[in-house]
Amino acid sequence: MLELNKRKEEAKVAKEQKVKAIVRTYYVIEGNKVKLKNKKCPRCGSIMAHHLKPNERWSCGKCGYTEFIGASKKR
């Protein structure tokens, strides 16, 4: 019983310590307009991540949609 309570407390502490994304890094202010730095996912509408390695691509962490940039060098 004590072990179960200990696990619950550890899970609660881990949940509280999660790092949230800093939303202000996704936008750029140009004059009086606010622009999004990254692309939006065409499937679900969330902000996509730009990856450079191993292949340059845009990927959505929410739905898994991926756009590859350029031709693949592997054959």
Curated annotation (Swiss-Prot):
Binding site residues for Zn(2+): C41, C44, C60, C63
Keyword annotations from UniProtKB, A to Z: Metal-binding, Ribonucleoprotein, Ribosomal protein, Zinc, Zinc-finger
Signal peptide (residue range): none
Gene Ontology MF, one: structural constituent of ribosome
SMART domains according to UniProt: Ribosomal_S27 (SM01402)
Cofactor stoichiometry and binding remark: Binds 1 zinc ion per subunit.
GO biological process, one term: translation
Positions of C4-type zinc fingers: 41-63
Domain of life (superkingdom): Archaea
UniProt keyword annotation of Ribosomal protein present: yes
Cellular component annotations (GO), alphabetically ordered: ribonucleoprotein complex; ribosome
Cofactor(s) the record lists: Zn(2+)
Assembly and oligomerization: Part of the 30S ribosomal subunit.
Protein family: Belongs to the eukaryotic ribosomal protein eS31 family.
Protein name: Small ribosomal subunit protein eS31
Species, as recorded: Saccharolobus solfataricus (strain ATCC 35092 / DSM 1617 / JCM 11322 / P2) (Sulfolobus solfataricus)
Gene designation per UniProt: rps27ae
